[in-house]
Amino acid sequence: MASAAAGASICIKSASFSPLAPGRISSLRSVSLPVSRKSFPSLKSSKSSFALRVSCQAKPETVAKVCGIVKKQLALPDDSEVNGLSKFSALGADSLDTVEIVMGLEEEFGISVEEESAQSIQTVQDAADLIEKLMEKKGH
């Protein structure tokens, strides 16, 4: 979320909320905190709005599996560097390649990715985060 003059807020979205004890949350995926410009004096002179995105990242093993699938689908050499920050477009993927990558991910992880969600995937990390979100919904 963003705000221009009076203040701003930090928003982290969540799929589930399970209280364990006062002040503790299990499977935290969302927190919204108001932020005063007084807390950040350097922002007082800024006329533009700002946003801070904090996301919970997928497990390293999920990212590694996605990297492997991306390399396979794009027929990249084994020594190609593919990591969470790798953009599909930078790896040479076109829209058809991206569809094939998503199909490979669906098969590997036993999930179904809706078209709208598939279109939002731009990086390996995006794909891994979406996979974990879908698997969590599925109960894995």
Swiss-Prot record:
So which domain of life are we looking at? Eukaryota
GO function terms (MF aspect): acyl carrier activity
Q: According to its UniProt record, how is this protein modified after translation?
A: 4'-phosphopantetheine is transferred from CoA to a specific serine of apo-ACP by acpS. This modification is essential for activity because fatty acids are bound in thioester linkage to the sulfhydryl of the prosthetic group.
Which Pfam families does this UniProt record tie to the protein? PP-binding (PF00550)
Domain (Carrier): give its ranges.
Answer: 60-135
Q: What is its main location?
A: plastid
Q: Where in the cell is it found?
A: Plastid, Chloroplast
- Cellular component GO terms held in the UniProt record: chloroplast
**Pathway participation:** Lipid metabolism; fatty acid biosynthesis
| Entry-annotated residues carrying O-(pantetheine 4'-phosphoryl)serine | 95
Which keywords, in A-to-Z order, does the entry hold? Answer: Chloroplast, Fatty acid biosynthesis, Fatty acid metabolism, Lipid biosynthesis, Lipid metabolism, Phosphopantetheine, Phosphoprotein, Plastid, Transit peptide
Q: Does the keyword Chloroplast apply?
A: yes
Q: Where is the transit peptide?
A: 1-56
Q: Which InterPro entries match?
A: ACP, ACP-like_sf, ACP_chloroplastic, PP-bd_ACP, Ppantetheine_attach_site
**UniProt cross-references to HAMAP family, sorted A to Z:** Acyl_carrier
The similarity annotation says: Belongs to the acyl carrier protein (ACP) family.
Q: What does this protein do?
A: Carrier of the growing fatty acid chain in fatty acid biosynthesis.
Name of the protein this chain belongs to: Acyl carrier protein 1, chloroplastic
Which species expresses this protein natively?
A: Cuphea lanceolata
What is the gene called?
A: ACL1.1
